[in-house]
């Protein structure tokens, strides 16, 4: 058979598949009244994957105009039902464990990165216990102790990094924030011993491990692709580093080399069934902590600095807020930051809050349907063949809740503070917290999988931003306005390159 016949048959088969797909969609809309509307698509299996992947929010808003808040689209062959709005967030993120499951969706992606038997590679009840174990580093006392550590990391970085040589220059702010936040996460959530190991080798390992969070790994986490081979090698090496620390401490009587730290805490933890936390799981939890503590802070920190560079007047407002609201030393200068200072810096926190509203790093939260789910107030029943998708960022970007929603305006929060009903407070087993789903603003998720590091994230970012603003001014480079677009090619969205901004030292200008 000639190549022309092969091509002809292939084209014929492709055309037939499209025709059958169109017939299926017609029949689906005509007879499946108990299912949400299906987003129109030409190519089977691919479905709406490309439109969704290129710009998820554009996809969500355009589909909402056509189909309403509830619709289904095909994501690489998988029927994915989206339910937008606060009711959708409640339905999906507060779904019962017997009805919706996060582990089945995320485990193939996260387990090769974090390791086995932690996070999504274990029953939810075990994850709840693991969250309780790490609250050691998120307690009030711990947060208070974190402030000087974070400030020192930023000051040392400004003094030692070639990015900030001299009195003025330019910097790739996304790269700089990635470095700063891995150092602050290391100092605070990991401890002195691990922080001392955050050298070039560790940075390379972290980078290779991070590449495991690529969208293709939702489907092919086992594929022998170059980035997966590097991911697996990096995980093995990073785990070995933690195991080595643990072994040395056990021989020395379980003592940290400096102040008590997370590893020492985890070495003393025991599950409810009486089983001590295995060393392997300690190592995997430490890897998870490092990546969780750095990922969102790095992305949001980059967006904050890009926004500030685009509006230098806000940079000066932040600096003046510190001068006006914080105590001074005898010579009139600002003293080192303390935990008590944070509450006296409302504009700093509003800058973070507003940036989280516009630039959340996770646009989609997924759950596998385990039992047929009737949607209250609708004729729809979601079958077990579907995955549910919640997009809390949609309400955060809606004029309905935030007038002129696409504008970055930290001052909007002076009259629009986020509220959480006391009736929404629930304890999933690791401390009382808000379910949060009734709010249109959910930058840290909601329900039992809500991020427990919210207070740390605000603290970390507030201290980083306050310290940078004390020492530097920022501005866009000549000819540039606004901020870059969003890169959705990674699982954790961030700013598109280039992300270079200008800076100058305050002391240099005042001199």
UniProtKB/Swiss-Prot annotation:
Keyword field contains Iron: yes
Localization, UniProt: Membrane
The keyword Membrane appears for this protein: yes
Residues that span the membrane, as ranges: 3-23
GO-annotated cellular components: membrane
GO MF annotation terms: heme binding; iron ion binding; monooxygenase activity; oxidoreductase activity, acting on paired donors, with incorporation or reduction of molecular oxygen
Membrane topology according to the record: Single-pass membrane protein
Cystine bridges: none
Cited Gene3D superfamilies: Cytochrome P450
InterPro entries: CYP450_sterol_14alpha_dmase, Cyt_P450, Cyt_P450_CS, Cyt_P450_E_grp-IV, Cyt_P450_sf
Catalytic activity: a 14alpha-methyl steroid + 3 reduced [NADPH--hemoprotein reductase] + 3 O2 = a Delta(14) steroid + formate + 3 oxidized [NADPH--hemoprotein reductase] + 4 H2O + 4 H(+); a 14alpha-methyl steroid + reduced [NADPH--hemoprotein reductase] + O2 = a 14alpha-hydroxymethyl steroid + oxidized [NADPH--hemoprotein reductase] + H2O + H(+); a 14alpha-hydroxymethyl steroid + reduced [NADPH--hemoprotein reductase] + O2 = a 14alpha-formyl steroid + oxidized [NADPH--hemoprotein reductase] + 2 H2O + H(+); a 14alpha-formyl steroid + reduced [NADPH--hemoprotein reductase] + O2 = a Delta(14) steroid + formate + oxidized [NADPH--hemoprotein reductase] + H2O + 2 H(+)
Principal subcellular localisation of the protein: membrane
Cofactor requirements of the protein: heme
Enzyme Commission number(s) of this protein: 1.14.14.154
Residues that, per the record, bind heme: 451
Keyword set, alphabetical order: Heme, Iron, Lipid biosynthesis, Lipid metabolism, Membrane, Metal-binding, Monooxygenase, Oxidoreductase, Steroid biosynthesis, Steroid metabolism, Sterol biosynthesis, Sterol metabolism, Transmembrane, Transmembrane helix
CDD domains found in the cross-reference section: CYP51-like
GO BP: sterol biosynthetic process
Domain of life: Eukaryota
PANTHER family cross-referenced by the UniProt entry: 24-HYDROXYCHOLESTEROL 7-ALPHA-HYDROXYLASE, CYTOCHROME P450 FAMILY 7
Function recorded in the entry: Sterol 14-alpha demethylase; part of the gene cluster that mediates the biosynthesis of the tetrahydropyranyl antifungal agent restricticin that acts as an inhibitor of CYP51 and blocks the ergosterol biosynthesis. Sterol 14-alpha-demethylase plays a critical role in the biosynthesis of ergosterol, the major sterol component in fungal membranes that participates in a variety of functions. ResB acts as a self-resistant CYP51 that contains mutations found in CYP51s isolated from azole resistance strains and that is not inhibited by the final product of the cluster, restricticin.
Family: Belongs to the cytochrome P450 family.
Name by which UniProt lists this protein: Sterol 14-alpha demethylase resB
Source lineage: Eukaryota, Fungi, Dikarya, Ascomycota, Pezizomycotina
Gene (name only): resB
């Amino acid at each position: 058979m000639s190549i022309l016949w092969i091509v002809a048959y292939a084209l014929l088969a492709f055309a037939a598949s499209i025709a059958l797909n169109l017939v299926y969609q017609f029949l689906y809309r005509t007879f499946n009244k108990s299912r949400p509307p299906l987003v129109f698509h030409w190519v089977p299996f691919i479905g709406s994957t490309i439109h969704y992947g290129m710009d998820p929010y554009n996809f969500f808003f355009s589909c909402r105009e056509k189909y309403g808040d509830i619709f289904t689209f095909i994501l690489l062959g998988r029927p994915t039902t989206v339910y937008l709005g606060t009711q959708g967030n409640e339905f999906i993120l507060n779904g019962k464990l017997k009805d919706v499951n996060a582990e089945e969706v995320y485990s193939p992606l996260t387990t090769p990165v974090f390791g086995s038997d932690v996070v999504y590679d274990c029953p939810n009840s075990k994850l709840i216990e693991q969250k309780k174990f790490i609250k050691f580093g998120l307690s009030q006392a711990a947060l208070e102790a974190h402030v000087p550590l974070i400030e020192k990391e930023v000051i040392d970085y400004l003094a030692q990094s070639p990015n900030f040589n001299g009195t003025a220059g330019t910097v790739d702010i996304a790269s700089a924030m990635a470095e700063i936040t891995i150092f602050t996460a290391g100092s605070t959530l990991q401890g002195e011993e691990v922080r001392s190991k955050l050298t070039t080798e560790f940075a390379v390992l972290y980078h290779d491990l991070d590449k495991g969070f690529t969208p293709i790994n939702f489907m092919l986490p086992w594929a022998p692709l170059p980035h997966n081979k590097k991911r697996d090698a990096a995980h093995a090496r990073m785990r070995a580093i933690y195991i080595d620390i643990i072994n040395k401490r056990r021989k020395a009587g379980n003592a940290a080399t400096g102040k008590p730290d997370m590893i020492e805490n985890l070495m003393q933890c025991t599950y409810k069934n009486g089983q001590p936390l295995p060393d392997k799981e300690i190592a995997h939890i430490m890897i998870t902590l490092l990546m969780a503590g750095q990922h969102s802070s790095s992305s949001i920190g980059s967006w904050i600095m890009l926004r500030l560079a685009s509006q230098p007047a806000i940079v000066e407002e932040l600096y003046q807020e510190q001068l006006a609201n914080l105590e001074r030393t005898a010579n009139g200068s600002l003293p080192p930051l303390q935990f008590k200072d944070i509450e006296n810096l409302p504009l700093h926190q509003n800058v973070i809050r507003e940036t989280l509203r516009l630039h959340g790093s996770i646009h989609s939260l997924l759950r596998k349907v385990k039992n047929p789910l009737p949607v209250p107030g609708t004729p729809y029943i979601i079958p077990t063949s579907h995955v549910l998708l919640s997009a809390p960022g949609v309400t955060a970007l809606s004029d309905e809740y935030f007038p002129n929603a696409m504008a970055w305006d930290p001052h909007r929060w002076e009259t629009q503070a986020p509220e959480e009903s006391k009736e929404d407070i629930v304890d999933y087993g690791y401390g009382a917290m808000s379910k949060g789903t009734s709010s249109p603003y959910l930058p840290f998720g909601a329900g039992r999988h809500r991020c427990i590091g919210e207070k740390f994230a605000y603290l970390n970012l507030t201290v980083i931003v306050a310290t940078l603003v004390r020492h530097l001014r920022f501005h866009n480079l000549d000819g540039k306005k606004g901020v870059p677009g969003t890169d959705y090619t990674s699982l954790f969205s961030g700013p598109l390159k280039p992300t270079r901004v200008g800076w100058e030292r305050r002391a240099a200008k005042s001199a």
